[in-house]
């Protein structure tokens, strides 16, 4: 993965490398390279260049309007003081280190992009650039690096269902072998495609909701982990389409029931040592890891504007559904917003991590990871104390006892999340004013777009957007 921002004309050796890659891709029958980024609403937007134009894209980028930073999921446009107008242009620069032949889309390759201005400066609303900057800052100021992974949950619907209806393509029970058998051919093709693309799959299994599945991948650096989240979903869509199926990663496809999550797994490391294991603090954490977790916990209400950013997210964030809707943490407690994963004895030094549960796949993965890391670093820098651990379901706590222990419900509406984000100076500073204002404008636009709809209407509005 490229560690520096693109420059007009290309980084040293970049154009020559792109020329060589173009020849290799052409020789393998690749005709087009998909250039992908994720907008503020969490939608993956793309442009394609013919394989022969890859070197030109590496040198001078590909034009795209900055207006997409204030697109809503339904493609309507809101605005800020800086973004949302028809003016201006940006350049999309492919990260050649992440260039991937798409095994499920013969003739195609894929690459994530960084966005810079026509003058060659980093675009202030580029989430990938912001995440890279925050990660670099952590290494410079604290000597800390991170490993991250994003879980991917989705539902599989019948491709021949009428209109925008969701009809589960499988009927087996949650986590059941019958469901795996029903999707056997498609699942085998998916695993083969991911392996061919270099994606390290840890697990694949049926999930709880009707027609729901999950894939978990190995941990990488945060930018690469976010890239993989986008690539995995692209691959799932492509494989499923070849089998006549329709998939959705939306937080909720129905007004009731369990939704799709996108839990973040994150661990902080220094000099090759995992700070979440081998320490003398609770759950084997080091004192620094405890403070990092405390920072994430303290910023959780505002974080939901970035990690659970859709009106449909609220249909998923319900108590007692393992969605983590209370400001609580616990060791292997799946109802807590923050789950401390200690790992199995013998591999804890590499397996221990923090799982952030109030996250779904309507989130821009770059912004979600950037904001969670920024929150944790704030706690680490201030040596923030981690409150008492919670066991069991926080929803069952007596209200007075919950209040005394600092356990409170996360924002119930998207506008409440925005209000918390507005007052969170740490997160706003981490994103920068241009991007922070875009987040607010897009979230309020999404909330307004579904005003008056019941839960079923909200679910239907976002069912096939993600």
Swiss-Prot record:
- Kindly list the positions annotated as binding Mg(2+) 1: 151, 263, 355
- Provide this UniProt record's keywords sorted from A to Z: ATP-binding, Ligase, Magnesium, Metal-binding, Nucleotide-binding
**Tissues where the protein occurs:** Expressed in mycelium.
Known cofactor(s)? Mg(2+)
Name the UniProt record assigns to this protein? Gamma-glutamylpolyamine synthetase GlnA3
The similarity comment for this entry is: Belongs to the glutamine synthetase family.
Residues that bind L-glutamate, according to the entry?
259, 316, 334
Q: What is its EC number?
A: 6.3.1.-
Which GO biological process entries does UniProt record here?
glutamate metabolic process; glutamine biosynthetic process; polyamine catabolic process; putrescine catabolic process; response to polyamine macromolecule; response to toxic substance; spermidine catabolic process; spermine catabolic process
Q: What induces it?
A: Expression is induced by exogenous putrescine, cadaverine and spermidine. Induced also by ammonium limitation, but only with a simultaneous low glucose level. Transcriptionally regulated by EpuRII.
Amino-acid positions noted as binding ATP in the UniProt annotation, renumbered to this chain = 202, 267, 334, 339
Give the molecular function GO annotations.
acid-ammonia (or amide) ligase activity; ATP binding; glutamate-putrescine ligase activity; glutamine synthetase activity; ligase activity; magnesium ion binding
Pathway the protein takes part in: Amine and polyamine degradation; putrescine degradation; Amine and polyamine degradation; spermidine degradation; Amine and polyamine degradation; spermine degradation
Entry note: cofactor: Binds 2 Mg(2+) ions per subunit.
Q: Where is the GS catalytic domain?
A: 127-466
Q: Where, in this chain's numbering, is Mg(2+) 2 bound?
A: 153, 207, 214
């Amino acid at each position: 993965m490229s560690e520096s921002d693109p420059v007009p004309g290309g980084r040293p050796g970049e154009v020559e490398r792109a020329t060589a890659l173009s020849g290799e891709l052409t020789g393998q029958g690749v005709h087009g390279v998909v250039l992908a980024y994720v907008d503020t609403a969490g939608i993956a937007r793309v442009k394609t260049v013919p394989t022969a134009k890859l070197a030109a894209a590496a040198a001078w980028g590909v034009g795209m309007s900055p207006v997409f930073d204030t697109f809503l999921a339904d493609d309507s446009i809101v605005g800020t003081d800086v973004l949302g107008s028809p003016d201006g242009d940006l350049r999309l620069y492919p990260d050649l280190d992440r260039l991937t032949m798409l095994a499920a889309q013969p003739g195609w390759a894929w690459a994530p992009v960084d966005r810079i201005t026509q003058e060659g400066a980093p675009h202030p609303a580029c989430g990938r650039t912001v995440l890279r900057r925050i990660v670099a800052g952590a290494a410079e100021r604290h000597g800390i690096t991170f490993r991250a992974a994003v879980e991917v949950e989705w539902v599989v619907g019948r491709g021949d269902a009428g209109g925008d209806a969701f009809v589960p393509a499988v009927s087996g029970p949650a986590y059941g072998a019958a469901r795996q058998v029903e999707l056997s051919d498609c699942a085998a093709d998916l695993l083969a495609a991911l392996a061919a693309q270099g994606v390290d799959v840890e697990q694949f299994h049926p999930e709880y909701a009707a027609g729901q599945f999950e894939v978990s991948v190995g941990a990488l650096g945060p930018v690469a982990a976010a890239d993989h989240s986008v690539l995995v979903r692209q691959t799932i869509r492509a494989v499923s389409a070849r089998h006549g199926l329709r998939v959705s990663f939306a937080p909720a496809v129905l007004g009731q029931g369990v939704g799709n999550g996108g839990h973040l797994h994150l661990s902080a490391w220094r000099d090759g040592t995992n700070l979440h294991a081998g320490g003398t603090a609770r759950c084997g954490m080091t004192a620094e890891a405890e403070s990092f977790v405390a920072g994430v916990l303290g910023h959780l209400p505002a974080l939901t504007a970035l990690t659970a950013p859709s009106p449909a997210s609220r249909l998923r964030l319900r108590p007692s559904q393992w969605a983590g809707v209370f400001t609580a943490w616990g060791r292997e407690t799946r109802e807590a917003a923050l789950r401390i994963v200690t790992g199995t004895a013998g591999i804890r030094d590499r397996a221990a991590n923090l799982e952030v549960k109030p996250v779904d796949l309507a989130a821009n993965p770059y912004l979600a990871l950037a904001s969670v890391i920024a929150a944790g670093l704030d706690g680490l820098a201030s040596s923030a104390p981690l409150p008492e651990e919670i066991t069991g379901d926080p929803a069952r706590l007596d209200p007075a006892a919950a209040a005394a222990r600092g356990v409170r419900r996360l924002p119930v509406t998207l506008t409440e999340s925005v209000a918390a984000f507005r007052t969170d100076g740490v997160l706003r500073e981490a994103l920068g004013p241009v991007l922070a204002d875009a987040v607010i404008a897009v979230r309020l636009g999404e909330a307004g777009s579904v005003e008056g709809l019941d839960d079923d209407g909200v679910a239907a509005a976002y069912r096939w957007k993600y």
